[in-house]
Every structure is written in C-alpha cells, then in structure tokens.
Amino acid sequence: MSVTGFTITDEKVHLYHSIEKEKTVRHIGDLCSSHSVKKIQVGICLLLVELCERFTFFEVVCNMIPFCTIKLGYHNCQAAILNLCFIGTSILTPVFVRWLTDVYLGRNKLVYICLFLHFLGTALLSVVAFPLEDFYLGTYHAVNNIPKTEQHRLFYVALLTICLGIGGVRAIVCPLGAFGLQEYGSQKTMSFFNWFYWLMNLNATIVFLGISYIQHSQAWALVLLIPFMSMLMAVITLHMIYYNLIYQSEKRCSLLTGVGVLVSALKTCHPQYCHLGRDVTSQLDHAKEKNGGCYSELHVEDTTFFLTLLPLFIFQLLYRMCIMQIPSGYYLQTMNSNLNLDGFLLPIAVMNAISSLPLLILAPFLEYFSTCLFPSKRVGSFLSTCIIAGNLFAALSVMIAGFFEIHRKHFPAVEQPLSGKVLTVSSMPCFYLILQYVLLGVAETLVNPALSVISYRFVPSNVRGTSMNFLTLFNGFGCFTGALLVKLVYLISDGNWFPNTLNKGNLESFFFFLASLTLLNVLGFCSVSQRYCNLNHFNAQNIRGSNLEETLLLHEKSLKFYGSIQEFSSSIDLWETAL
C-alpha cells in the first residue's frame, strides 16, 4: 500500500473521530438542556406545593386561638396548648411518614393517602369553622346548627387528618433534601441553609399576607380557600408523580435503628451480659454483635455520632419554647391589644409577617459574614456564636413582652370586634408589640441556619439525613415541651400566670420566667459549644474502613428521581440547590 493510502486512511480516522466527538458534545448538550428544564420544573412545582401546604398550615395556626376561645369557648390555656400540640404533631409526622415509606408502604401509595387525608381535614375544618350565625347563599337561607359536642369531635378529627396529610407532603414531596451538598465545605453549606430559610420565610411572608386578607374579609373566603388550596396542592403533586419529579432520598441509618442501638446497649451492659464481650471502649459498644448485642459495627458507630449532637439538640428545647410564644402567648397579647388603625381592623397574621422580615433582610449580611470575614477553619466558632446570640435575642424578646404586658394593662379598656364578637381589650396599640416579634425573627435568623449546618456537617455524609431527622424530632419535642410548660404554669399558679382574662392575671410573670430559663439555657450551651467548633472532626479520627464511602460520596453528584438518574455539574448554584 502506498504512503498516500495511509494518509487518506488517517484523515478518515480523524474525520470519523471529529464526527463522533461532535455527536457526543451535542448529546451532552441536549442532556444538560433537558436536565436544566427539569430542574426548573421541579423547583416551580416544589415552591407551589410548599406554598399551598404552608397556607393551610398557617391558616390553622393563625386562627386556632381566636376560634377556640371565641367560637368554642376554650380557656386561653387550652387554646394555646392545642395550638402548640398541632404545630408539634405537624413537625413530627414527617419523621413518622419517612419511616412508613422505608419500611411498610411505597412512596406513591403513601402520597395518595396523605393527599386524601389533607383534603379531608381541610374540608372538615371548613365545615366546623363555618360561621355559626345565619347566612345566605344567594337567595337560599341556611343555618349551621352543628351541636357543640359534634363540632368539637369534628374539629379534633380535622386537625389530626391535616397533621397526617402535612407529614406526607413534607416528608416525601418537600423534604429538607440538601442533596448535592456533599461536595461543599462548611461555608457553602452555610450559604445553602441561609438561602433555604430565606426562601421558606419569603414563602411564609406571602402566606401570612394572604391570611391577613382573609382575616379582614368575610368568613366564606376561609371556607372556600382552604379546601381549594389542598386540591391545588394535590393536583401539582400528582403531576410531579406522573413525570417522576419527586426526589428520592437514599435509605440510611434510620431513627429507629439509632434508638434500637441505645436500647440494646442499655440491655447488654447489664451485669449478666458483661462476660460476652471484652472489646468495649464506650457504653454503645455493648450493642455490637461481637459484644452480645444485635447491631452491626456500622450502625453502632453511626449512632455514636448522633450522641455527640445530643447536647446541642437538648439545649434547643428551651429555645423552641421561646419561639413557640408567637402562636401562643404573643397571640393572646395581640388579641387583647388595640388592633384598630384609623378605622381599619388590623389582622393578627400581620404580626407574623413582621416576624418573618428580619430573615429576609439579614440573610445577605449573614452570607457576607460567613463567607468573607470568617475563614473555613473558624466557621464552627461563628455558628456557635450565632446560636448563642439567637438564644439571647429570644430571651430579650420574651422579657420585653413581659414589660409590654405590664404596660398594656395600664391603658383604659375599649371594645373591639373580633371573629364576630365584641371583646373588651386594652387601648394600647398593637404596634407596641412589634419589637418582640422582630427580636424573635432575628433569633430565628441566627439560630436556624447555624443549627442546621452543625447538624449536617458534624456527622459523616452517610448519616446526615438521619441527623436532620433528629433535629426535626427535637423541634417537635420543643413544641410539646412548651405545651407542657404552659399546663404546669397554669396549674401551679392557679391560672394566674396564664389567665383566661389577661387584665385579671399576670401573664408577664410567665414571660419573665421563660426568659430566665432561656438565659440559663444559654449558659448551659456555652459550656458545650466548644465541642462543635470543628465541623470535620470525624475526618481526623480513626473511623471504620467502610467510611471510605465518605470520600466516594464527595464525588457523587446526582439527583435521584423515580426511575431516573440525572447528572449535574459540580458548579451548581446554591440558589438552584435551594429551589
């Protein structure tokens, strides 16, 4: 063969490779374009589902105390406890639903059940909350004459079914999935959670403004809008299921496994089991199979990491009790203040919108402080400082609420219409209470992102989802602890510290007591905060060989949907991740 033949063949080979390379590049471009469109579609659907779910949830929370006290005749203490229990149950049900999804039921089947329960609850709530007075639908005259006993039963059933429905939506459709963060360090993780909570509060602000309009309008808007929002949420969720747009998280060490390890360790450390194992360096080692337990070394070491976060979670219980004063003590204080603004009756939900403003304003500043002023090695100290400062702001808010409660009772009484009844309230303008709402908003701005980053980064990546579940669990326990505290204070003080008529009691004493507990909580957290300064401490320890998965997960950059795996660039924007 001639040299010319070799040259032509070589040119053909180069031409062939060029064509194949062009096809590959075009194919990759099409995949990237398709994935970008899918990401935008997922983000829009998630925001709409979150908006509908938050609207129904906050609609119940914002109207619970006025409805229970004015319509159902509950005492202030009973209404506050019921509201706190509803919030706590709504926080805990996603953890329960995730467990059902992983163990017993399929994801799609559970989503269908939860959507039905959510719509059933909103429909029942609308029937119960329908105005008790006569009303007209066109020329048709109707009367809502549901007996009080049946009304109370339907009300509890509606609240329970809404909680179960919310659990399914939050756990499966809108989970706190910080997927794609394994490749980032502490500073980028802080940026993610800053903007994640910024988006959540923007969503909440829109919801509160919408609820404010409903509270200002007639009651029929409530009857029609809550079931409508539930139906809209169901339609969007069904669309996401049909087009495989729901993120599917990986199954890791579960909460039940962690609890089981603790129980097994306590059982096998009994003297009669001590002879079964010698290789014991900690209490949890008793739960290992080689030491007489029934759990693998992998599960035991994962649980050990959770125990290091336990003091952090416990010290957040009292902080949560302060934050939960917005839907309990602060609501009662606002209801008994003058809501009349030049003839315009200000809706109570406006105060919630005001408490959301600090995060919307301060998030960019936190972003600057965490990324520009503090090097990566000092991010842990910065996060601990944020948590301490947030707790101090919460204590200051509750203390100021106590002073304003004393001040409020010195104003002359006026009559004010609320929920169809005329109440005798203080003439102190409700704008005096803005400061305490703002301070609690600042506390949430500082604590929530910092606490989430520590919970996420302080453990290996293979158990971070379970760590976030533990954080959710303690947030729910904080609501129930707050309800228990309200009940104990009511019983011990004979109703004086949480009175049914605020002008005849001393609600300020309850606020001062809560502020004192929060300050003690700050001192306790300061004593353990140093252990959370190094967010990558587990990398320096002699961790099991199976934790080589930690390194592999740092390079795993994929979003997993039903039946599909989409690759995405490591330069993904944090705003897109939050969406």
UniProtKB/Swiss-Prot annotation:
CDD domains: MFS_SLC15A5 (cd17349). The keyword Membrane applies. Pfam families: PTR2 (PF00854). The chain crosses the membrane at residues 77-97, 110-130, 154-174, 191-211, 221-241, 304-324, 343-363, 386-406, 422-442, 472-492, 509-529. GO terms for cellular component: membrane. InterPro entries: MFS_trans_sf, POT_fam. It is a multi-pass membrane protein. Coiled coil: none annotated. One of its GO terms (molecular function) is transmembrane transporter activity. It is found in: Membrane. Keywords: Membrane, Peptide transport, Protein transport, Symport, Transmembrane, Transmembrane helix, Transport. SUPFAM superfamilies: MFS general substrate transporter. GO terms for biological process: peptide transport; protein transport; transmembrane transport. Belongs to the major facilitator superfamily. Proton-dependent oligopeptide transporter (POT/PTR) (TC 2.A.17) family. This is Solute carrier family 15 member 5. It comes from Homo sapiens.
